[in-house]
A protein has these predicted regions:
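Beta/alpha (TIM)-barrel catalytic core signal, keyed to glycine-rich beta->alpha loops juxtaposed to Asp/Glu
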Residues: 3-9, 132, 136-327, 346-361
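Short acidic capping loops at alpha-helix termini that bridge into adjacent secondary structure
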Residues: 24, 79-83, 87, 120-124, ...
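Active-site mouth loops of central-metabolism enzymes
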Residues: 28-37, 92-107, 128-134
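Conserved beta-strand positions
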Residues: 27, 56, 87, 124-127, ...
């Protein structure tokens, strides 16, 4: 018997300026991408909680992430039409054409990814990192070739600067190509500038979607590192998924820990939830978040994280304002030069928390 997501337990949002709908929580296997059992158990739990979006990359374990995801989908007999699968292309080896965003690597790369995933197509293919050496026209045309060949339905970017994404949109307009629909970006309570400030015009002009990664700041927003670094923590192996979050945290530990303790108090006293659940709820409360990717080293962590969906429903203006004051890192809003004053941040305008403008300059 085939399996599919339990849609009664989840909210679904349109991914950018497209007709594709994704669960507000998705699953990514950048953590423990070589663990077959963890992958199988995690996907099963995700489906039970309504998750329909599953993300991987050719670079996760140099292909093993795609292998384990494909194997699990097959073993669980997941209905292909009921889920949204994405992978990302950039680097798979050390040979000259094994990396970057040339037409050769993009077309050959996705064909090899599909073999590992045991799929005929992916719903979304991402450019995993920017490549300023390859002409942007070549990359945009290659992504369109994938769509024309039926190997992917949509394409997106990951960790691209706003100017390069804007250039991609303009190239697609000029050449009458299908533009990207989303950006996979790092966003959480402590990393806000890119999503809330740098991408502001992309959201307004192109309705760009987002697939958020590292919503817990590499686990720091669970609060488990306040007292000490646990022996079984991935930070003991200096593994923060390339986000540099651990160094940032340790360099400013006293300041971060003070905020974490206050946020923990808000979570427990106001919402009867964990700090991690509050942090996840805060991310999906932003209307510019299309989906938030969860990853866990244990299934019980994933199970606890899904409870954040109920916390998200309880976030009101007063709690959101209290969180803003605690974080005190609100990216600056646009400047109204007629009155020479700063407007509220885009996030706070969208959430109608428009009377608070504290934070960074």
């Amino acid at each position: 018997m085939s399996t599919k997501p339990d849609t009664s337990k989840m909210e679904y949002r349109y991914l950018g300026n497209s007709g594709l709908r994704v669960s507000v929580f998705g699953w990514g296997n950048w953590v423990n991408n070589q663990d077959d059992k963890l992958t199988l158990d995690s996907i099963k739990l995700c489906l039970e909680n309504g998750v329909n979006f599953f993300d991987t990359a050719e670079g996760y374990g140099l292909g093993t992430g795609e292998l384990t995801l494909g194997k699990a989908l097959k073993e669980l007999n997941v209905e292909r039409e009921k889920v949204v699968i994405s992978t990302k292309l950039f680097k798979i080896g050390d040979d000259p054409n094994d990396s970057a965003l040339s037409r050769k690597h993009i077309l050959e790369g996705l064909k090899n990814s599909l073999k590992r995933l045991q799929l005929d197509y992916v719903d979304i293919v991402f450019c995993h990192r920017p490549d300023r050496q390859t002409p942007i026209e070549e990359t945009c045309k290659a992504m369109n070739n994938l769509i024309d060949l039926g190997l992917a339905f949509y394409w997106g970017t990951s960790e691209w600067e706003s100017d390069l994404i804007m250039e991609a949109y303009k190239v697609c307009e000029e050449l009458k190509l299908i533009p990207p629909i989303c950006e996979q970006c790092n966003y959480n309570m402590f990393v806000r500038e890119r999503v809330e400030d740098e991408y502001r015009d992309l959201f307004k002009k192109y309705k760009m979607g987002t697939t958020i990664w590292s919503p817990l700041f590499s686990g720091i927003l669970t609060g488990k590192y306040i007292k000490e670094i646990p022996k079984d923590s991935r930070f003991n192996n200096n593994n923060d998924g390339g986000s540099n979050s651990f160094k940032t945290y340790m360099d400013n530990k006293k300041e971060y820990d003070a905020k974490l303790m206050k946020l923990k108090e808000i979570a427990e006293k106001k919402l009867n939830c964990t700090l991690a659940q509050l942090a996840l709820a805060w991310v999906i409360a932003n209307p510019d978040t299309s989906t938030c990717l969860l990853g866990a080293s244990k299934t019980n962590q994933l199970e606890e994280n899904f409870k954040a969906f109920e916390v998200y429903k309880k976030l009101d203006k007063n709690i959101l304002l209290e969180i803003e004051k605690t974080l005190n890192n609100t990216p600056r809003g646009e400047i109204d030069y007629r009155d020479w004053k700063e407007l509220p941040s885009r996030r706070n305008i969208l959430l109608d928390v428009d009377y608070y403008k504290g934070g960074s300059n």
